Amino acid sequence: MPGPTPDSSRDVRPTLEAVAALAGVSRATASRVVNGGAGVRKPLVEQVRKAVDELGYVPNHAARTLVTRRNGAVAVIIDEPEFRIFSDPFFSQQIRGISRELSVYDAQLVLLLVEGSGDFDRVARYLAGGHVDGALAFSLHMDDELPSIIRRFRVPTVYGGRPGRPGAASEPALPYVDCDNRGGAAEAVRHLVSLGRRRIAHIAGPRDQTSALDRIDGYRDVLPEGDPALLAEGDFTVEGGARAMTQLLERHPDLDAVFAANDLMASGALRVLRERGRRVPKEVALVGFDDMVSIAEITEPPLTTVRQDVEGMGRLMVRMLMRRLNGEGEGDELESVITPTRLVHRASA
Amino acid sequence: MPGPTPDSSRDVRPTLEAVAALAGVSRATASRVVNGGAGVRKPLVEQVRKAVDELGYVPNHAARTLVTRRNGAVAVIIDEPEFRIFSDPFFSQQIRGISRELSVYDAQLVLLLVEGSGDFDRVARYLAGGHVDGALAFSLHMDDELPSIIRRFRVPTVYGGRPGRPGAASEPALPYVDCDNRGGAAEAVRHLVSLGRRRIAHIAGPRDQTSALDRIDGYRDVLPEGDPALLAEGDFTVEGGARAMTQLLERHPDLDAVFAANDLMASGALRVLRERGRRVPKEVALVGFDDMVSIAEITEPPLTTVRQDVEGMGRLMVRMLMRRLNGEGEGDELESVITPTRLVHRASA
């Protein structure tokens, strides 16, 4: 990325010396005022502030960070391409919780967008630059470099979702917030069993994410002897859910229930079932995961699904990070939190 | 926002001296390597890099910026609450264009989210901290403080949409990218006139945004003698469009066409027309603005609308900013760009 020419005279920023000169005070006094220091008489404070405003003086960033180590900013990093972040309501709900809770702490939310994992070099440079006090990272994949980048630059971080690689035995666990993926999935499948369904399929998420693996485990907890052909893998998108549903109907035309690992895939599955003339829930009962109200309440029929408190989890991540930044326990000692899930009954199952 | 206790020994970052000592080189040599400088023999470069990795050394941010004044990062600031940014496809399209083009320049997109205009103090502090090389700002409102904040901290900036307050006569104009709001609106209304429609209503956007005002002007250009009761104000949301349509039908039950200032409001208007049993386009013809494909192609009937190249405008904003950062003309001299619009014919008019 190009920068301005170094000798560009029009781009020279005013110095603290210029502020002091304009205010008619010593450099030390000007410095104390700029750094919010006490011990300066009020009229002098006002003179200096006026000079700062007049000159458009910008305090030296690093000098301030050395004193307080506070940028008043927290990075949010999501390992998904920008278009998924804006099309999957899961991310907007989580960001909503984070944004609202950061406001409470008067901290600026800095969302670092990437086009793909290849862009993490750039994210690493930004984190290395010391522009943020901490980070919240989510949607990690198994082969994700982010935890090692974060560890290398010693950025206090809380993860959303259990990270896939806990690291070598010598490395401490990473602090995270996650919902009870396994327990919630098991509850969904038990509900389908209780309705008398016998051929219960599962549309799983991508196997490089722990949330998908844990939900498969919950499905298997209830159906340990289930036919492996009743399990198809989607990618947490509407289209992925539709593709998986098509495969499942080809392999098992007699299936009578589907548990999809998120609501987006459930809505894709629902479309395929409707196109094939399968009545939901009469012929095929369907349960999703997430309880994204913007999806689950508008599908026809509305979706029975496993609710997780996505916004609340975002808020919790912020509070954990703030405790860490407050010096209350290192990240290494910060306890991870698993939040409960709850089956929400609607018409689809 | 709380920071770690200053004397927290576990939080001490490794110094350049420690890197030099571990690598067995002088501090000057270590500094040259860290700053990417030439003139250091390759084996020494490798020794220093190894020490940097081992210690997790983070280069002093300000020292680097003083040399190059490049953070490799650009802020994107949108004066809308976070929930609107994630629910209005206009913003995701613009961010998509910006994200892709910034990738070309290997610059990190830093999206600064706010809950409301009250949060601009915090954004100002972040900009003042010198964490970004420049900014892209959009969705400004008339009373927006953002331009004055940006001017004060001398952050090179390109605006998306013509800013509402060009500033005092002594202040130079702000560089912006916008579409031909007025010309596009006039084309939409001329199309409705050409279909023989005589009572053409307009659902306008909020009057504190120039895009809304310019589209009203385009409507008036074609219908200078139109009944003022045929104009209702929405807020660029689906619900706002529905409310405005309800008002218009109460005031003018005989209206035979509607031009809505964006597609979201057009889809809300369409819902109300359907609920009232008005056939579109037979009884009421409807034209939107934006051509958000995710809306205009899925409404029933599909929406005739004024297309603006939102993603392309985002890309253009990045290229203009990069020219500025390259020293090719100051912001004051950078020419603003108005991009053309085009009427896209679908079934609704």
Residue ranges and their predicted role:
Chain A
Residues 1-11, 73-190, 250:
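Alpha-helical recognition/docking segments in bacterial nutrient-uptake
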Residues 1-72:
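N-terminal helix-turn-helix DNA-binding module of bacterial transcription factors
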Residues 26, 72, 133, 198-199, ...:
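Short acidic/polar active-site loop segments enriched in Thr and Asp
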Residues 29, 69-84, 191, 199-205:
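Short beta-strand segments enriched in small/hydrophobic residues
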Residues 80-93, 111-119, 176-187, 203-246, ...:
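Hinge/beta->alpha junction and helix N-cap segments in small-molecule ligand-binding domains
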Residues 199-200, 226-229, 280-286:
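Short acidic capping loops at alpha-helix termini that bridge into adjacent secondary structure
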Residues 251-349:
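Flexible loop/turn connectors
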